[in-house]
Every structure is written in C-alpha cells, then in structure tokens.
C-alpha cells in the first residue's frame, strides 16, 4: 500500500468519478449525439453503458485487489513487468501537452460566454484555473472529492430543473420502437459518445486513497458510472425535446440556450458557472491522477524530489511538476494558436490503448468470470481502436517508441535491467 493518505469514502468516490466522466462532455456530447443519430441516441446511451460495463468491472476488480497510485501502469507492471509499467505510465503522461490545454480552453470558453473575454483574458482564466487546481490539490484528495461531489449535485440539479420547468414527462420521450432503430445512426452516436466514459483510468490512480478500497472503490466506480450515464441520457432527452441542436449551433451552447429559453437571460450565468465547474472537475481529477502517477513512478528512488510526500501525505512536488508542464503547454499553444481538434483525436487513441493494456493485465491477473470480462473488454477496446481508424496509429507508434526509447532501469538488488 502506498504512503498516500487514505481519506476517501463511498460518496466522495462517486462524486469524483461521476464528475470526471461528465466533465466537458455533459454540455456538448448530448447535442452531438442528437445531431448524428436523432432519437436513436436515446437507445445509444443504455447500449454504451452495457458495452462499457465489462471494462468498468475489470477496472473495479483490479482496483479492489491491487490499489495503487500507479493506476493502470501498476496493473500492467504486475502482469507484464516493470518495463511495460513505465511505458504505460509515460503513455498516460503523454496526454498532458494536448488534452489538458484543450480542456482548459473549453472551461475558459464559459468566461467568454459570460463576460465576452478574448485572447489574453482567456489565457489568464486558463492559468487561474490551474492555480485553483493547485490550491485544491495541496489540500488532499478529500478536498477534491468534497468539491466534486457538490459539482455533481449542481449538474444533476440543473438537469432536474430543466425537466421540471420544461414539463417533460416520460410519455413525451421520443423513444424509437426497437424495430425502427437505425443501426447506422446508433453506431455513429456510439463513436461520439464513448469519449464521455474516458475517465476510468484516471479514477484508478485514487484507489489507494480510499479508507476501505476493497469495499468502496468498486462501488464508487459502478455507481458513478451509472449516475453519469443517467445524467447524459437525461441531457439527451432535454436536447431532443427542445430541438436544441444542429449543424449551425455550437454543441456546448445547447444547454445554455435551453436555460435562457426557460428561465430568461438572467439565468445564463447559472449554466455558465455549472459548465465551468464541470470542466474544472474533469481537469482536477486528471491533474491529481497525473501527479499520483508521477509520484508512484519515482518510487524506485525514494530520495528523488518527485518521490517525496508533504507532511499531509500529499504528492505536492509531483503536482507542481505536472502543473508546470500544463502552464508551459498552455503558453506555447496560446502563442502558436495551435488548433487542437485533430490532436485530441490522437489523444483519444492513447486512452483506448491504455484501456486495452488494462484489459490485457486483467486477462493475466484475474480468474474465472472476471478474466472472461477482461477478454470481452479487450475485444471492445480493439473494436474502438478500429473505429478511430488510421489515427489510432499514433497510439501504436507512441507505445512502440516509448518501449524502444525509454532507458532501461537497473534494480539495486540484483542489477537486472528492466
């Protein structure tokens, strides 16, 4: 067990996972799914949850039996050795320069909607968000969990308020009959919606900080997954009911438009604040997870700067290093005005590759029906890589490159290189 402070309970874990899954997607993905699949997207959410369940269960069982700040990298190391563990860790960290600045831009975009910010003002908002992540992170996982549980409650409250004010009744939900489902539209929606469930790998890094990881980590993961899926489905119903989607409308503008329609322009700030907090929650759990991964990877040298914990058993040095990388990436991307859309797709391929490595580790570490679920999850990950298409080559090249280029490490006990 790691030296990190064990302070997370079940409710806090549910709040952490549900907000990490909702994140930037809750304001945008339901509108995108409605655009590509129409009413078929109402069936796509339960189908997607069923497909993700094998992967989630494998994460839950591995996290219960092998809780570690190393997350997926730790599972892979136990199954295939320390070299692939390091490769997996660096593969996860390689998302920092692309994924986090993109999420920062989305979060700062709500400031643009509220105050008309542009250019340097948005940059200051992004840097301010990182400062807030640092402040919360130095207070420990419990502080992050408490905040994100509140954010999860606000997101749910917003959707419930829209349902109530919009007088949406179950009889009004336009569920297509099973025989009328268009498979082409369903598959198109699934390919868009999968990214809402990227976040399980980040949550795995917090398993060792639960008070009772064997009992509460799997429960938090499964309940958080179902809660996030229910919120996404509820958002999709709202978007379809108010016809708040289209090729000429920004996907992230759908819920704010509905809020203004129901509650007036004065309520726009409510949607923007909740949207910002949802983005912040996703950013926060990823940055805290990256910090714990960096800390765990530095444990081969306990005297290393990054391997040290604060007096409160928090990896502050690793957190500072991760945030430093985020600041540099944000400044470079702002200066060069880089378009991140294509790069995010490449990053998504890396996430699927990490999921696949976790499933392969599960095939080796687990027994019985859980091993079978790991096999099913692995096949689903291969299918998802195929759906990404040729852009998945980026993840494969990164994996091969890290395997070849990472220097071999000598273990002090026997001098064996890994």
UniProtKB/Swiss-Prot annotation:
Intervals, Cytoplasmic compartment: 37-41, 111-113, 169-182, 241-257, 339-341, 400-418
Places the protein is found: Cell inner membrane
Phenotype when changing residue 195 to A: Strong decrease in methionine efflux
A GO CC annotation given for this chain: plasma membrane
Membrane topology, from the record: Multi-pass membrane protein
Keywords, alphabetical: Amino-acid transport, Antiport, Cell inner membrane, Cell membrane, Membrane, Transmembrane, Transmembrane helix, Transport
Periplasmic topological domain residue ranges: 1-15, 63-89, 135-147, 204-219, 279-317, 363-378
InterPro entries noted in UniProt: AA/rel_permease1 (IPR002293), APC_superfamily (IPR050367)
Means of activity regulation: Efflux of L-methionine is inhibited by the proton ionophore carbonyl cyanide m-chlorophenylhydrazone (CCCP).
Triggers of expression: Induced in the presence of intracellular L-methionine, L-leucine or L-isoleucine.
NCBIfam families: PRK11021.1 (NF008245)
Protein name: L-methionine/branched-chain amino acid exporter YjeH
Gene for this chain: yjeH
